[in-house]
Amino acid sequence: MIKNAFLFLALILTALWTQFSISAERQVECWVVGVSDGDTLTCLLPTKKQFKVRLQEIDAPEKGQPFGKKAKQYLSLLVFKQNVTLSVSGYDRYQRILATVYLQEQNINLEMVKNGMAWVYPQFAKNPLYFQAQDFAQQQKIG
């Protein structure tokens, strides 16, 4: 009986540790297994745990909106089936992980804005590089 209770407690603690381990780490490496739209992707950890990632500081058109399909395709071209590093800042209201996505040294969030596939999310953007990239894309009439 005590052995079963100990095993049950160990399972609960393991489940809780897995749930919170992503937010506890600032940097997470994962494999991109899906792209929902121009600012959301699905990652797979080496432990086979999947989770949604929302690219922070930017916003992209949704599937049914103009350029929505193009934004999704561009993000897919950049990161689908790639190992990426997430710089995690927390969770959004839909419990997706908020992160800046890096492919090697390339800031993917910034690339989306620079190439006119996303715009700056002014309520949440802190990095001035995003605003500069958006100005550049608008001046060049990209996207």
What are these regions (language model features)?
Residues 2-143:
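Small beta-barrel nucleic-acid-binding modules, primarily SNase/OB-fold domains
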